Amino acid sequence: MNLKSIRYSEVLRQVAVLSISATIIISCGSSKAVSKSKNSSSSKVSKSESLRKLDSKFDGKLSGSMKSILKDAERYLGTPYKFGGNTSSGFDCSGLTTKVFDENGLKLPRRSADQANTGKNIDLEEAKPGDLLFFATAGGSKVSHVGIVHTIENDGEVKFIHASTSKGVIISSLNEKYWNKAYLHAQRVL
């Protein structure tokens, strides 16, 4: 192989790596983990920033199937992100939801955009743990990320479990600026 061929091969490899990296970032977004402390401001946004009020009026009653889905999703907390992944060795966002619901006898389509058309579209105020939340992480209205409602705090704050490209499977809040701006809608599949 001559020097020109080697350089050309290296350029092609770099273009491929950049393309794959861009696809990963766009396909499942990224997030900061929500702090466990109730007094922490790391998951909140300063009052000067304008965010949508994205709260639920969930009454706190969970069915057995919802509890099972949440328990299964929690098992994967800390699992790394893997583009196209749907196993405990690594998940992308829709791989996580597909796996968790499959473990509970519910088949979901593999892609988040297809999952967004499964079940019943609901107002966020009606959302409860086990429902799916959909996001447009690249802006606009095209679904590119999905998460499972995990908890509804006493003040109505919605927290969800999902596979973040930067931190793997974590719990985030709709009160975080990134997710608040990217939120599209909720679906009930149970």
Where are these regions (language model features)?
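Bacterial N-terminal signal peptides that target proteins for export
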Residues: 2-16
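...with weaker cross-activation on analogous glycine-rich loops/strands in unrelated enzymes
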Residues: 106-167, 176
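Extracytoplasmic/secreted envelope proteins and their assembly/folding machinery
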Residues: 66-70, 74, 94-98, 127, ...
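Acidic/histidine-rich, surface-exposed loop or edge segments in extracytoplasmic proteins
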Residues: 49-54, 74-83
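Post-signal peptide N-terminal segment of mature Sec-exported envelope proteins
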Residues: 33-68
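Aromatic- and glycine-rich peptidoglycan recognition patches
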Residues: 2-5, 29-41, 58, 149-190
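Catalytic cysteine-centered active-site loop
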Residues: 60, 79-129
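C-terminal motif of bacterial Sec signal peptides marking the signal peptidase cleavage site
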Residues: 23-27
